């Protein structure tokens, strides 16, 4: 049970009615971050990872191709 989280229903620990998410890199104030919001900066051959706007997870983006150098 996570009663300290304002997004979390204390009984089910799922998002409260009307809220999108409880936690995650793409969740802020119980709502999904906008699509295209950087959730993880790229390093080396990895590109930036971006929020989708429909999930609190930060999906992995593909590696940079040689054409992008």
From Swiss-Prot:
Motif (Cell attachment site): 43-45
Keywords: Cell adhesion impairing toxin, Disulfide bond, Hemostasis impairing toxin, Platelet aggregation inhibiting toxin, Secreted, Toxin
Cystine pairings recorded for this chain: 7-30, 21-27, 26-51, 39-58
Database matches in Gene3D superfamilies: Disintegrin domain
PROSITE patterns the record matches: DISINTEGRIN_1 (PS00427), DISINTEGRIN_2 (PS50214)
InterPro entries in the record: Disintegrin_CS, Disintegrin_dom, Disintegrin_dom_sf
Top-level division of the source organism's lineage: Eukaryota
SMART domains attached to this UniProt entry: DISIN
Residue ranges of every copy of the Disintegrin domain listed in the record: 1-66
Signal peptide interval: none
GO MF terms held by the record: toxin activity
One annotated Gene Ontology cellular component of this protein: extracellular region
One Pfam family linked to the record: Disintegrin
Tissue expression profile of the protein: Expressed by the venom gland.
Keyword ATP-binding: no
Entry's localization field: Secreted
Presence of the UniProt keyword Zinc in the record: no
Function: Extremely potent and selective inhibitor of integrin alpha-5/beta-1 (ITGA5/ITGB1). Partially inhibits adhesion of cells expressing alpha-IIb/beta-3 (ITGA2B/ITGB3), alpha-V/beta-3 (ITGAV/ITGB3), and alpha-4/beta-1 (ITGA4/ITGB1) to appropriate ligands only at concentration higher than 500 nM. Weakly inhibits ADP-induced platelet aggregation.
Assembly and interaction partners: Heterodimer with EMF10B; disulfide-linked.
Family per record: Belongs to the disintegrin family. Dimeric disintegrin subfamily.
Name of the protein described by the UniProt record: Disintegrin EMF10A
Species of provenance: Eristicophis macmahoni (Leaf-nosed viper)
């Amino acid at each position: 049970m996570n009663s300290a989280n304002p997004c979390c229903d204390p009984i089910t620990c799922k998002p409260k009615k009307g809220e999108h998410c409880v936690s995650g890199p793409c969740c802020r104030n119980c709502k999904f971050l906008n699509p295209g919001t950087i959730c993880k900066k790229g390093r080396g051959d990895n590109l930036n990872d971006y929020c989708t706007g429909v999930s609190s997870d930060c999906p992995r983006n593909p590696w940079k191709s040689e054409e992008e150098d």
